[in-house]
Regions:
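A charge-rich, low-complexity, intrinsically flexible signal that marks solvent-exposed coils, linkers
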Residues: 2-128
Length: 128
């Protein structure tokens, strides 16, 4: 009998934190470019909104809205960017919560912590 164990996350992509996106999210918070209450499922950018944004913005600007970078994915492809937290105009508190939840669900600890820290940062700014 071998010691082979089934890795339940074997086919789950690996992500690193997009530090530029964290910096951009903090800038949005500092300049009050956020929505505290929204229906994230209604405002989360879908393919149509993503494509429209990319027609008039750079990949660098697109990347700034995503907390995760997919390891191994080609640069300047949508597959490279994950964990969107805003609607390409404003940060959404529920977008950060969705990032936190999804990262925790799939055990992407660095993304989970980045989303959590941004939530705390936002909540401190609101309270002050």
């Amino acid at each position: 009998m071998g010691d082979a164990r089934l890795d339940e996350n074997a086919h789950v992509p690996v992500y690193t934190v997009n530090k530029d996106a964290v910096t951009y999210a903090k800038r949005l918070i500092d300049t009050r470019q956020y929505v505290l209450r929204s229906r994230w499922q209604d405002v989360q950018p879908r393919a149509r909104e993503q494509n429209a944004f990319l027609k008039t913005h750079s990949w660098e600007e697109y990347a700034a809205w995503h907390l995760g970078l997919t390891e191994g994915a080609d640069e300047e492809t949508k597959a490279r960017y994950a964990f969107v937290y805003g609607d390409f105009r404003r940060l959404h508190r529920l977008g950060l919560i969705a990032c936190h939840y999804r990262a925790a669900e799939w055990r992407h600890k660095a993304i989970e912590l980045a989303a959590h820290e941004l939530l705390q940062y936002l909540d401190r700014k609101i309270a002050s």
